[in-house]
Amino acid sequence: VYAQAGMADREAEKPIERNTIFRLYSMTKPITAVAAMILMERGMLDLYEPVADILPAFAHQKVERDGKLYTPERPILMHDLLAMTSGLVYPEEQTMGGRAVTKVSEEACARLESDHPVSTQEMAEKIAACPLVFAPGTSWQYVGKPAAGNAAVDRTGRVYLCKFYAEMCGT
């Protein structure tokens, strides 16, 4: 659509206009993917590199299977983080990994307004300690890319993710 089409509010019969504002969700995922592709193009990132080579906290990942924890056959690769095949999961109550991520998320939210909010690095380390819900590369699950973003930032030596994204986007 190169102009405008449809209704902004069907009940009120209000049409979409050129300046209609929309909420956009999950936009850090494509931005992180573009940043990773730029780093790959510059020779600074290998998509098939183990994440643990960049973020050591991911070196000892475990996979939950039948209520027990196992060492996966292979590590999480950068490609897995971007393709959502890492085994990482959003907060939920059905799996051991999901419950662990729920606790991490609750702590991060509780500390948000404190003097010690959870840093991106700390969040990646805490997520790395959570069990995976499947072995890397064996399945797909919609999940965010904070670890991928943190790995990209770590690889470039940048400290602040927002600054890195702004530089990657040319702003």
Q: Each predicted region: which residue ranges?
A:
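A short, well-structured edge-of-sheet supersecondary motif
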Residues: 1-15, 47-49, 114-117, 128, ...
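Short, solvent-exposed loop/turn and secondary-structure capping segments
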Residues: 2-4, 92-97
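Short glycine/proline-rich turn/loop motifs
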Residues: 12-18, 104-108, 125-134
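Active-site helix/loop module of the DD-peptidase/beta-lactamase fold
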Residues: 18, 23-27, 39-93, 129, ...
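Short amphipathic alpha-helical face segments that pack within enzyme cores
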Residues: 30-35, 144-152, 167
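Alpha-helix-centered segments that form part of catalytic cores
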Residues: 78-82, 111-135
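Amphipathic alpha-helical interface segments
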Residues: 96-114
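Cytochrome P450
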Residues: 138-144
